[in-house]
Amino acid sequence: VILSAQFTADLTATGQNTQHLYFVSRYEDIPQMQRDLSGDRPFSRMAPNFYMYRIYDIQNDSRFWKTFRTKHKVNANAPSAPYVKGDLGIMYVVNQPGDTRFSANVLNNSPSVIYTPTGKTIPHVYVAYKSGQTTDIGWNDTRRYPSLSKFMDGSRTAGFNDVDGLRDITLARSAETYLIAAEAKVRLAKLGTGAYTDALPYINPLRARAEYKNAESRSVYYDGGGAPSSAPQT
């Protein structure tokens, strides 16, 4: 982070950060689920398009899994049998056109989708591309989509309905600065000054940072859902 608008845990200060409200999909209106602090309070105003989901090399680029929340655990006070709290309750399948594994875009308790650790079906599965589908309509619903997790704020002190976030707002990131420099090199190359490869010293460091490292756990990542009051944005 190069520049941020800083907020404080002092609730008597003027103004708080409400940015966390707008990027999260609805989950609390689904059976087996209820609103909680880590899931945030979903106003669901901003959802990525399919291009944004598909631009990543999902196998090797850690940024996808560290940017989008694709699973929710069952958290209802009295979940219906055979489910218990902590079971996988919601899963978004971010697949590609041509995938023939799924018969529908919405699969509820489908025997075709089993969560291996528990041997149970998953109550709610939302698939981007069902078998035979090539158009981007799998999540054609303003409520259901993998949530951008970068702005989640678990540091809110008044509970899960609190709208007043405490995390800083990032105004300028180092990665964006690198990409602006790379774009400048590309534009110069188009004008005949320099080469396109001059952009690589600015692009490759970002690729190196984003790739999964040796022995890095792919199932563990940080998002703001469990953030302490002083949690930085990364």
Residue ranges and their predicted role:
Residues 89-159:
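Amphipathic alpha-helical assembly segments
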Residues 193-234:
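A long, glycine-enriched binding/interface module in the latter
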Residues 1-118:
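An aromatic- and glycine-enriched ligand-binding surface/loop that stacks and positions planar moieties
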Residues 62, 66-68, 150, 187, ...:
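Acidic, mature catalytic/reactive cores of soluble proteins
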Residues 1-28, 137-174, 187-200:
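Structured, solvent-exposed acidic/aromatic patches
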Residues 173, 179-180:
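Short alpha-helical basic/polar micro-motif
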